[in-house]
């Protein structure tokens, strides 16, 4: 039998029908639903007189539009309130396996809530009307975002139409240095292959450095796969995966658990499996990263200087660099560790889990927010993350440092709620995108790890966390 990649196994086990041109009907196991991309889909079902094909495949929460402060005042923005209220009504009418509404203890960012509830399991196909659905590939699952019309199609048929992507292996060999996190690995990879490097591919991450990551680190890495242009990102199942899933609310139990684990252990690329493309990187080459421009690929290690567009020979790239520097208000040659910040945001589906908050708290402990830093927002990814952080006293560390301890939600990752930048504000952010206006009109976003963000908060500028022992 031909050796298969993990992607081959996941894809082939979910093909319902294949046409001559390679288009397939792909069966979907888990559908994650939030308030932004679901209203039109539910409305389409109503107009056609249809019901959900499988109610028990749907897990839902409100996250994009929910405020992360002053919950006693409710949702003030009328459009945001309408979307959240509409989700409430639609779930009550159509049903779901689980629904965590606004202010529920389990509510949170869909890509944080799903895994912590055990709604994401190895071997599944997982879709959501959100581009960062690739996060769930960390479990040895095939996960990717879909558009609103596909949301409706999945609700009605439990399938999507798709064509198989090419396969790519990105291996990081060796051991990561102290102070280097999964976020740094993700940004480094994107810096090396570019934001189009993974276009048309399903990416499997492998190598010693990847296997050493926790599940939360793997989720961060797979979350960022889309920023390299990939359709999906995934990590093979190992004991780390199985240990994380065990005893989660929606994980199998008893004999079903034993059978599931037996199957899950097969979710690895076979020896000799051939990928369409491979990249290999050395973990020793990766340092703490900071983006300097308006694309995740515009990234360098903290010891670098802002690049000079004049040294770029490609005229298209040179023009892009010039525009980025103008928007970001930076001058070529400026050391990254001399760039001051106005705002710090620690949160998002990339970096708002308990390990992320622990990393940030370790830096913030016994330190204070720098005088030039206007605000530091700490936004846990879910109510359960918030609860755990408070049990560990992390909230007290943040508050004593002068940071804001917020309620769960997508928050300042994107300007769809009350948390946003104003024109010209420079933000050290643990989110996944640094596009123009992503965090607010005219806002300037620098992507970093949680520890690097916390370091910027207490020093007032980008700082190598390895210098803060």
UniProtKB/Swiss-Prot annotation:
Catalytic activity: (2R,3S)-3-isopropylmalate = (2S)-2-isopropylmalate
UniProt keyword DNA damage present: no
Cofactor: [4Fe-4S] cluster
InterPro entries from the UniProt entry: 3-IsopropMal_deHydase_lsu, Acnase/IPM_dHydase_lsu_aba_1/3, Acoase/IPM_deHydtase_lsu_aba, Aconitase_4Fe-4S_BS, Aconitase_4Fe-4S_dom, IPM_dehydratase_rel_enz, IPMI_cat
Coiled coil: none
Keywords assigned: 4Fe-4S, Amino-acid biosynthesis, Branched-chain amino acid biosynthesis, Iron, Iron-sulfur, Leucine biosynthesis, Lyase, Metal-binding
Residues the entry annotates as binding [4Fe-4S] cluster: 349, 410, 413
EC number: 4.2.1.33
Main enzyme class: lyase
Pathway noted in the entry: Amino-acid biosynthesis; L-leucine biosynthesis; L-leucine from 3-methyl-2-oxobutanoate: step 2/4
A Pfam family recorded for this sequence: Aconitase
GO molecular function, one term: 4 iron, 4 sulfur cluster binding
GO biological process: L-leucine biosynthetic process
Textual note on the cofactor: Binds 1 [4Fe-4S] cluster per subunit.
NCBIfam families according to UniProt: leuC, PRK05478.1, PRK12466.1
Function: Catalyzes the isomerization between 2-isopropylmalate and 3-isopropylmalate, via the formation of 2-isopropylmaleate.
Protein name: 3-isopropylmalate dehydratase large subunit
Organism whose genome encodes this protein: Neisseria meningitidis serogroup C / serotype 2a (strain ATCC 700532 / DSM 15464 / FAM18)
């Amino acid at each position: 039998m031909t050796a298969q990649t993990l992607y081959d196994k996941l894809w082939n086990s979910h093909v319902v029908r294949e046409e001559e041109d390679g288009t397939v009907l792909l069966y979907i196991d888990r559908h994650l639903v939030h308030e932004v991309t679901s209203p039109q889909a539910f409305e389409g079902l109503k107009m056609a007189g249809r019901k959900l094909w499988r109610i028990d495949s749907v897990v839902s929460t409100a996250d994009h539009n929910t405020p992360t402060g002053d919950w006693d005042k409710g949702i003030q923005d009328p459009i945001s309130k309408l979307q959240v209220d509409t989700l409430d009504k639609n779930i009550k009418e159509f049903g779901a396996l689980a629904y965590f509404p606004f202010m529920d203890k389990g509510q949170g960012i869909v890509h944080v809530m799903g895994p912590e509830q055990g709604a994401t399991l190895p071997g599944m196909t997982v879709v959501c009307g959100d581009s960062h659905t690739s996060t769930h590939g960390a479990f040895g699952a095939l996960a990717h975002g879909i558009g609103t019309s596909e949301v409706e199609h999945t609700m009605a048929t439990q399938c999507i139409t798709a064509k198989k992507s090419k396969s790519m292996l990105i291996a990081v060999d060796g051991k990561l240095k102290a102070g280097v996190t999964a976020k740094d690995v993700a940004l480094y990879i994107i810096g090396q292959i570019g934001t189009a490097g993974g276009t048309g591919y399903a990416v499997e991450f492998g190598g010693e450095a990847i296997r050493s990551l926790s599940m939360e680190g793997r989720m961060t890495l797979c979350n960022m796969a889309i920023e390299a242009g990939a359709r999906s990102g995934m990590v093979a199942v190992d004991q780390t995966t199985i240990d994380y899933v065990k005893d989660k609310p929606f994980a199998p139990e008893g004999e079903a658990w034993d059978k599931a684990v037996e199957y899950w252990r097969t979710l690895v690329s076979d020896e000799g499996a051939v990928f369409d493309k491979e990249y290999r990187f050395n973990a020793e080459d990766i340092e703490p990263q900071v983006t300097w421009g308006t694309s995740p690929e515009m990234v360098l290690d903290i010891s670098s200087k802002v690049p000079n567009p004049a040294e770029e020979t490609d005229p298209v790239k040179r023009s892009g660099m010039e525009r980025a520097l103008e928007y970001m208000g930076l001058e070529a040659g400026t050391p990254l560790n001399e760039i001051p910040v106005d705002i710090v945001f620690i949160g998002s589906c990339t970096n708002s889990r308990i390990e992320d908050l622990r990393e940030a708290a370790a830096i913030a402990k016994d330190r204070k927010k720098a005088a030039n830093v206007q605000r530091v927002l700490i936004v846990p990814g879910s109510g359960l993350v918030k609860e755990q952080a408070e049990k560990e006293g992390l909230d007290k560390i943040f508050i004593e440092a002068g940071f804001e301890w917020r309620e769960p939600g997508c928050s300042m990752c994107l300007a769809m709620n009350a948390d946003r930048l104003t024109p010209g504000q420079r933000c050290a952010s643990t989110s996944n995108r640094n596009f123009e206006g992503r965090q607010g009109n005219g806002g300037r976003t620098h992507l970093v790890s949680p520890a690097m963000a916390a370091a910027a908060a207490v020093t007032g500028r980008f700082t190598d966390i390895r210098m803060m022992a």
